[in-house]
Amino acid sequence: LDQLVQNKTDPPNNENRIEFKEKNLGKKIRDLFPSLIQPWKPVTNPAFIFLTLLFLLHIVFFPKTTRIEGWSVFTGMIHNVNLVFHEAGHILFGFFGNDTLAIFGGSLNQLLIPFVIFLSFYYNRDRAGTAFALMWFFGNFIDVSIYMADGRFLTLPLIGGLDMEAHDWRNLFNRFDLWSFVQALSKTIFYLGWVGIFLTE
């Protein structure tokens, strides 16, 4: 009798066992993150207009190549905001005591901050906020890719008028001898940024 009861309660085969485990995993995730099963908040008309305008500004004014000599007014404003998080990244990751991580931390933090904000909006099921954070996140791919490409040409001005010895990506490419991959790496990051922006819209 005990065996019959066990056979009725246990999944009868491997396929059912897998399905059983997947359902349990899904239940555990829902229990840990109950907000993820909530419906998305609707996008208000002002938010929709703002996001559409922001997307169009990206299309018109954001760089179409990794080689630029300066920023437009719009991209300059965005870049200056990103620059705050970039410089903060050097300080933050510098606490780990690793020189390479401290150098890389500037560009890394540019991506981490909008990604964390994206996770927050996503967790709260805020559709407009999620779209905004993703556009900011992928826009930083473009910003970082331009800085990467400039590691070879050194035409962009550095903060505080620092010389080329302070160029993050010049130092990183030197350190890992990646000069033959500069163009491929920077263009890959650049196009990932643009694809992400289009998919966000």
Predicted regions: what they are:
Residues 20-21, 26, 30-67, 98-201:
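Metalloprotease/metallohydrolase-associated module, dominated by Zn2+-dependent proteases
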Residues 1-9:
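Cys/His-rich metal-coordination motifs, chiefly Zn-binding "fingers/knuckles"
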Residues 75-79, 95, 129-132:
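N-terminal hydrophobic alpha-helix used for membrane targeting or insertion
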Residues 79-95, 106:
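Active-site recognition of the HExxH zinc-binding catalytic motif
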Residues 12-24, 75-82:
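Short, charged cytosolic
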